[in-house]
Amino acid sequence: DILPDTPSGVSGGSKLTKVTDGAVAFDGADGTALSLDNNSDIQLGSGTNWTIEFFAYRTGAFVNYDVIAGKGANSTYEWFIEGFADGSVDILYSADGSTTWTGQHEIMSNMALNRWYHIALVRNGSGANNFKAYVDGIQTFQTTAFNIYAGTGVLHIGGYNGATAQDPPITISNFRIVNGSSVYTTDFTPPTRELTDVTNTKLLCCQSNT
């Protein structure tokens, strides 16, 4: 399904405006996530510069560990962006591929229902405060840059096809992975048009329902 009013910008500092560039709606049913096979372009590994970004619109309640997007398998963890029952959204990652997370950091404390958000996760170099999360262009978190296990797991968007009850009711638009560049390094005005194939773009999807 495609949500009629899909996002491409913001009005003021709070709500994203109506957009016309397309999105993919996930209804929360098991096995309905978008899955993409592994390739080296989307293995973040120890790369010092990368960006994951997308627009998201939650249409129902999260349960703990709902997968908004992520890469990895049941036996080999890489990274996941997950929603929780209290409405918060975290990034979880493994540096060694084990099934114990190396780190878990909150991106936002509450993703409200029926509202578009632009979310961006950025690594910009190595060292202190070189990983940052942004929601609607405002930095919400920073920490020391971290490595992510460069595994061969599938990339999942809008749920997790490797298990049951990890599929949120959510609409995703303009999902982009840039591997080799940091698109944002400080607070910014969220995009007002569909995302484009900038330098080092390795994946750009969910711009229509096909």
How should each PLM-predicted stretch be described?
Residues Y77-E78, T99-Q104, I138-T143:
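Surface-exposed loop/edge segments in extracytoplasmic proteins
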Residues D27-W50, G72, T102-N110, N161-T164, ...:
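Short surface loop/edge beta-strand patches of beta-sandwich-type extracellular domains
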Residues L92-H118:
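Short, aromatic/His-centered strand-loop micro-motif at the edge of beta-sheets
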Residues N74-S75, A112-R115, G127, T196-T201:
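Extracellular repetitive beta-rich solenoid segments
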Residues D1-A29, K132, I138-F141, I172-T210:
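Extended recognition patches within non-cytosolic domains
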Residues K71, D96, G151-S173:
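Extracellular glycan-interaction patches encoded by glycine-rich segments
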Residues T32-L92, G125-N130, Q166, S181-T186:
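Extracellular glycan-recognition modules
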Residues T51-G60, A69, I119-L121, I157, ...:
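Short hydrophobic/aromatic patches on beta-strands that form ligand-binding or substrate-lining surfaces
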